[in-house]
Amino acid sequence: MTSALTQGLERIPDQLGYLVLSEGAVLASSGDLENDEQAASAISELVSTACGFRLHQGMSVPFKRLSVVFGEHTLLVTVSGQRVFVVKRQNRGREPIDV
């Protein structure tokens, strides 16, 4: 069953799972991230740390989206109000970029 809280998350292409957090507590979860309290805790700490890097005074959250890229998947983190939305997406096969 899809709630208003998660209906957009269900439709994200290549989505492997999601978490919806509020103050570190899991409000909703699915797929690979279903009931993953360890991931929820780590992501909450990551968001808290990232929020400490304020470049401009007055910004409520200093970033729009935080991406953590692993070999085969990426965690996309978005903060909206008091909620943290996390989506685990499958990385599409691309050639590595040489820098």
Swiss-Prot record:
The modification N-acetylmethionine is found at residue 1. The modification Phosphoserine is found at residue 67. It is found in: Lysosome. One of its GO terms (biological process) is positive regulation of TOR signaling. One of its GO terms (cellular component) is Ragulator complex. The modification N-acetylthreonine is found at residue 2. Keywords: Acetylation, Lysosome, Phosphoprotein. Phosphorylation at Ser-67 by PKA inhibits Ragulator complex assembly. InterPro entries: LAMTOR4. Belongs to the LAMTOR4 family. Part of the Ragulator complex composed of LAMTOR1, LAMTOR2, LAMTOR3, LAMTOR4 and LAMTOR5. LAMTOR4 and LAMTOR5 form a heterodimer that interacts, through LAMTOR1, with a LAMTOR2, LAMTOR3 heterodimer. The Ragulator complex interacts with both the mTORC1 complex and heterodimers constituted of the Rag GTPases RagA/RRAGA, RagB/RRAGB, RagC/RRAGC and RagD/RRAGD; regulated by amino acid availability. The Ragulator complex interacts with SLC38A9; the probable amino acid sensor. As part of the Ragulator complex it is involved in amino acid sensing and activation of mTORC1, a signaling complex promoting cell growth in response to growth factors, energy levels, and amino acids. Activated by amino acids through a mechanism involving the lysosomal V-ATPase, the Ragulator plays a dual role for the small GTPases Rag (RagA/RRAGA, RagB/RRAGB, RagC/RRAGC and/or RagD/RRAGD): it (1) acts as a guanine nucleotide exchange factor (GEF), activating the small GTPases Rag and (2) mediates recruitment of Rag GTPases to the lysosome membrane. This is Ragulator complex protein LAMTOR4. It comes from Bos taurus (Bovine).
